[in-house]
């Protein structure tokens, strides 16, 4: 079983792509410092959410599509400057 350390690792990579852009898919999505970058990320989240719904109905690729949705959601949090700990603390608060 994998622990939440993998989320931290993915989050660090996303932060690195934001802070030291290279020619990668992730860097390109965050490249614009204006509303266009955010809109592109939000559009991807919408696409991935739809793909999760379709995968759920077809019982195909659900895990892969869910991972894509979570990845793009984390990308949005990084773009907006939200620390990963804020997300984890919110999950912890909901357990109570």
UniProtKB/Swiss-Prot annotation:
The organism's place on the tree of life at top rank: Archaea
Gene Ontology BP terms: L-histidine biosynthetic process
Recorded catalytic activity of this chain's protein: 1-(5-phospho-beta-D-ribosyl)-ATP + H2O = 1-(5-phospho-beta-D-ribosyl)-5'-AMP + diphosphate + H(+)
Biological pathway: Amino-acid biosynthesis; L-histidine biosynthesis; L-histidine from 5-phospho-alpha-D-ribose 1-diphosphate: step 2/9
Keywords: Amino-acid biosynthesis, ATP-binding, Cytoplasm, Histidine biosynthesis, Hydrolase, Nucleotide-binding
EC category name: hydrolase
GO cellular component term, pick one: cytoplasm
InterPro entries: HisE, PRib-ATP_PPHydrolase-like
Enzyme Commission code(s) on record: 3.6.1.31
UniProt subcellular location: Cytoplasm
Gene3D superfamilies: MazG-like
SUPFAM superfamilies: all-alpha NTP pyrophosphatases (SSF101386)
Keyword rRNA-binding: no
GO-annotated molecular function: ATP binding; phosphoribosyl-ATP diphosphatase activity
Family label: Belongs to the PRA-PH family.
Annotated PANTHER family: HISTIDINE BIOSYNTHESIS BIFUNCTIONAL PROTEIN, HISTIDINE BIOSYNTHESIS BIFUNCTIONAL PROTEIN HIS7
Listed name of the protein: Phosphoribosyl-ATP pyrophosphatase
Originating organism: Methanothermobacter thermautotrophicus (strain ATCC 29096 / DSM 1053 / JCM 10044 / NBRC 100330 / Delta H)
């Amino acid at each position: 079983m994998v622990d939440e350390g993998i989320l931290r690792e993915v989050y660090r990579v996303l932060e690195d792509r934001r802070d030291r852009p290279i020619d990668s898919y992730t860097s390109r999505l965050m490249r614009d410092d204006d509303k266009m970058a955010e809109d592109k990320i939000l559009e991807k989240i919408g696409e991935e959410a739809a793909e999760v719904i379709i995968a759920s109905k077809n019982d195909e690729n659900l895990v892969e599509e869910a991972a894509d949705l979570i990845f793009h959601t984390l990308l949005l949090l990084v773009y907006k400057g939200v620390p990963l700990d804020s997300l984890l603390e919110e999950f912890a608060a909901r357990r109570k």
